[in-house]
Amino acid sequence: GEADAFITGVYTKYSNTIKVAKEVVGIKPGYEHFATMHILNSKKGTFFIGDTLINRHPDTDTLVDVARLMEGAVRVFNHEPVMAMASYSNFGSDTVGSPAEVHEAVRILQEEDPSRLIDGEMQINIALDKELRDRKYPFTRLRGKDVNTLVFPNLSSANMASKLIQYMSPDVEVIGPLQIGLNKPIHFTDFESSVRDILTITAVAAIDAIVSKCKCTENCLI
């Protein structure tokens, strides 16, 4: 087709549109998974959270892909990604289940790029409270840094976090979900999306399409 971007989801199920999108346009080379993220604009700054829509129970490899995709997407919005892999556990305090998978994902990502500003696993308050984090865990490579990117351990926690923030903090501007990782700019809305939400996602999709046409390989949403 001739379209440069596609917005879907208002009158269809997420699961159906996600499956079709993946089958039609495929996943970006170098990745096995795609994801979505939300942008939160607040008085405390701009934050990026994911994966808020796609991967229900991500394993270590999926979390690695999500983190790498979010890292590139955050740069598109002219922010330097300082990333925390979220969990109920802190830096190996629980060694089984989800925390162990998150911990292993952090190890892989740090070995892959020693300059990458990412650490975890850690609880949300540890991630966002720089002074507390530096005092309790002085060994972290995020020492002295303000975290702006949160990779959640599963879809339930990320989705609930974004919904809770929208409900409890109406002054926070929430943008998303923004698809990251497919070969084309396909973005998803739902029946709860307002006109403003749809317009915002459409604007992001337009930027996404422009970046795609410039054949961006790293710092792009798709």
Each language-model region and where it sits:
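Anion-binding alpha/beta catalytic cores of soluble intermediary-metabolism enzymes, centered on
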Residues: G1-G144, N148-I222
